[in-house]
Amino acid sequence: MNDVKQSSLFSWLLFDLANTVYAFVIPGLYFSVWLVSEQGWTDQALGFATSSAMIIVAITGPWVGARSDGSQGKKPLLFITTLACILSTFLLGTFNVNTSVLLFIISLIGFNLGSVVYDALLISVSNEKNRGKISGMGVAFGYIGSLIGFGVATYLQNIGYSYIEIFRSVAILFMIFSLPAFIFIDEKKVSSLKSNIKISESLTIVIKSWKHSRKYPGLTRFLIGRFFY
């Protein structure tokens, strides 16, 4: 890690913590409880909203990933997706329930597409020798984020905060912990990669990669499982 600034690495790790706070508290627990228990929606309707977001991510994700891999500036794209997630999370419950569900879908899309860009920044905070280790450290920080998110949300609920106030608190936590990434991460330059790729081209690449992956036993099952995870 001698060729990577510690501030750059730590900021990258903090971003994993930040988005896991969101993932654990909002889609993982509190939004579904608020929507079903307090707003009278069914689990099936919530599942449809979540599936809608995931379909959009599945279509646009390869394009975002290809653009981030080939772009010299990944942080602006990460900023846009993160801002979309934070703002829509902060506004959950502010308007009527249908608008809140739409905001929830936007937050899920922003979170998942942001994760694609975030993963592409791994090359900027690691080298070939320690990339696996750094990636594992990111996962560890993610677990810390889940504990922080659960602890803060539970505490706020116990002292009488409403679900809407918890949503806003999570959005603020996401903003605080993600901010260093936009300030301190030093991006490495990428050479000879196309950054102005079209969505149709990215889907073609995915199909070719999928066919190629079938040559490796177990890889297809792993990719399917990772997608649903």
Write out the residue ranges for each language-model feature.
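C-terminal membrane-cytosol helix-exit motif in multi-pass small-molecule transporters
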Residues: 149, 153-154, 172-191
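C-terminal ends and interior cores of transmembrane alpha-helices
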Residues: 79-97
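Helix-loop boundary and gating motifs at the non-cytosolic
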Residues: 2-54, 218-229
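Glycine-rich segments within core transmembrane alpha-helices of 12-TM secondary carriers
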Residues: 132-154
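Intracellular juxtamembrane helix-capping segments at the cytosolic ends
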Residues: 113-127
